[in-house]
């Protein structure tokens, strides 16, 4: 009997004494049930519909171009026009390159494909309505000039970074805020339950993924209880992020429990421009004075409920105080846009300021400067990338990074390599166990260039690191939802917190240092690859912006 089969039996049946032939049949039945379940799943139906639409579109374009020269000429002119349009857009050069290459390779079909699924050109109605929702909170997000002057007097370098966030994202920097860093999903879950139970007035939650299980079921039970007590409880989840984890129209089931709920950007199985723009944020706001954000979704995977990818490494942060209002604003802006179809309400944003119920919150120590920020694909400002670039380019001693995916453009890659070449201690932590094989392979394709530049690259050997962290010089850090990949930096709704001179900075540093110790450092020898693998890496890097 082969070693692989023996391993298969043991894995499936926990080393029982089942006869090998019977075990093989049982394993086959188990696999068949999984296949049948997948064929009945919403994901399979959606994927099939998209493939059929894509095939029909391609076949139609090819047929028309083959038999009608005028149509062929129109498609070619369209592709040329699209190429010129792409070149003149304010997109990342790598994103432009992959689309221009694709269009030039398939000129008849490429231009049409870009117009349908490429780019980030949202409908005017979509942009206008989101901006209108933002206007409602804008006047309450004005920068306190005294805080700005105090930060500038303390550190002009940090003041410049903060000023960029204020101008690009329209969120001010605050004092009078406590920050508490949580280095795992388990720590976040424990603190989340504690804070939810204390809620007296309202709870706002916004997540990319929710999945039935211990974590979400526990949270849902509390939300239902609080809604029954008369609290304003609102839940928002991304319809694509939760495509495989909750049933179809799950938002309606949640509303039946007395909880206001909407699915962000409801997914329709059609080739569409809006398919790319997902809500990757993770936000919890409780009574205006307390907020959470970070990498964790509401699913058991994030609290190591099951070892799908080995040990799951997570990072979250809690804010208590004035800075919480920025997250309240982010939530209400998005809620206002999508909730109109379910709820008729005129929101008085003053009611949600942290000062309204601050006296009821447990007093905690305030320190330093805290600046939450949001990033939206509906404008031409890549705020999250700007935050990362500012942190990297202004570092003098060290830059410690954790990211589940490292698939970046030339600007961020060059900045990181230049910092290392300038003598800054640059370290990057990525997963050892892949959740998406092709993205993991693309991440590894950057290793050689990084290591040659002097960057110390580590893989988290216990499993999968999902933290999104940057900490610099024992002074400043950012914790949030933003992966170092094209989707997070250019296509998704994201958020994070910039933290300066707060105990959370040291906590992030200590967490990363201890995690580096149990991770494998990548050497130049590890990055060697044969001809075929180098070719694969080249292709992966070329198409990285589409991942």
Where in this protein do the model-derived segments appear?
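C-terminal structural cap/anchor segments
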Residues: 424-484
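Helical hairpin unit composed of two closely spaced alpha helices linked by a short loop
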Residues: 395, 405-426, 431, 436
């Amino acid at each position: 009997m082969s070693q692989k089969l023996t391993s298969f039996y043991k894995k499936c049946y926990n080393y029982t004494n089942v006869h090998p032939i019977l075990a093989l049949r049982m394993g086959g039945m188990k696999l068949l049930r999984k296949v049948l379940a997948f064929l009945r799943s919403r994901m399979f139906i959606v994927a099939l519909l998209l493939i059929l639409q894509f095939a029909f579109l391609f076949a139609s374009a090819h047929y028309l171009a083959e038999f009608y020269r005028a149509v062929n000429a129109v498609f070619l002119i369209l592709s040329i026009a699209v190429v010129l349009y792409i070149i003149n857009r304010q997109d990342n050069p790598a994103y432009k390159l992959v689309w221009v290459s694709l269009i030039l390779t398939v000129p008849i079909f490429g231009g049409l494909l870009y117009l349908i699924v490429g780019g980030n050109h949202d409908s005017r109605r979509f942009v206008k309505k989101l901006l209108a929702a933002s206007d409602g909170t804008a006047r309450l997000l004005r920068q306190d000039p005294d805080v700005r002057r105090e930060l500038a007097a303390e550190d002009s370098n940090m003041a410049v970074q903060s000023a960029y966030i204020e101008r690009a994202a329209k969120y001010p920097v605050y004092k009078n805020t406590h920050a508490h860093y949580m280095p795992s999903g388990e720590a976040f879950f424990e603190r989340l339950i504690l804070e939810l139970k204390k809620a007296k007035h309202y709870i706002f939650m916004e997540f990319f993924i929710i999945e039935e299980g211990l974590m979400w079921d526990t949270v849902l039970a509390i939300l239902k209880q609080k809604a029954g007590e008369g609290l304003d409880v609102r839940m928002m989840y991304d319809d694509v992020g939760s495509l495989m984890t909750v049933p179809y129209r799950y938002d309606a089931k949640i509303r039946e429990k007395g909880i206001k709920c909407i699915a962000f950007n409801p997914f329709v199985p059609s080739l569409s421009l809006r398919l790319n723009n997902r809500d990757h944020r993770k936000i919890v706001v409780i009574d205006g004075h307390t907020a959470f954000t970070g990498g964790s979704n509401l699913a058991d995977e994030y609290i190591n409920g099951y070892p799908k990818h080995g040990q799951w490494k997570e990072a979250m942060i809690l804010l208590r105080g004035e800075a919480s209002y920025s997250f309240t604003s982010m939530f209400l802006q998005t809620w206002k846009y999508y909730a109109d179809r379910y709820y008729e309400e005129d929101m008085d944003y003053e009611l949600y300021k942290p000062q309204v119920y601050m006296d009821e919150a447990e007093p905690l120590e305030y320190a330093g400067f805290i600046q939450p920020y949001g990033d939206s694909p509906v404008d031409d400002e890549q705020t999250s990338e700007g935050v990362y670039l500012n942190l990297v380019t202004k570092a003098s001693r060290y830059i410690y990074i954790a990211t589940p995916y490292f698939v970046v453009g030339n600007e961020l890659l060059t900045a990181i390599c230049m910092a290392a070449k300038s003598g800054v201690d640059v370290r990057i932590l990525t997963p050892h166990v892949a959740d998406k094989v092709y993205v993991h392979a693309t991440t590894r394709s950057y290793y050689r260039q990084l290591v040659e530049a002097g960057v110390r690259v580590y893989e988290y050997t216990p499993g999968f690191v999902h933290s999104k962290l940057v900490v610099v010089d024992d002074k400043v850090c950012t914790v949030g939802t933003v992966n170092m990949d094209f989707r997070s930096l250019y296509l998704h709704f994201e958020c994070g917190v910039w933290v300066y001179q707060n105990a959370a900075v040291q906590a992030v540093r200590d967490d990363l240092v201890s995690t580096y110790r149990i991770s494998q450092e990548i050497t130049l020898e590890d990055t060697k690859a044969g001809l075929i693998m180098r070719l694969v890496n080249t292709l992966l890097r070329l198409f990285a912006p589409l991942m």
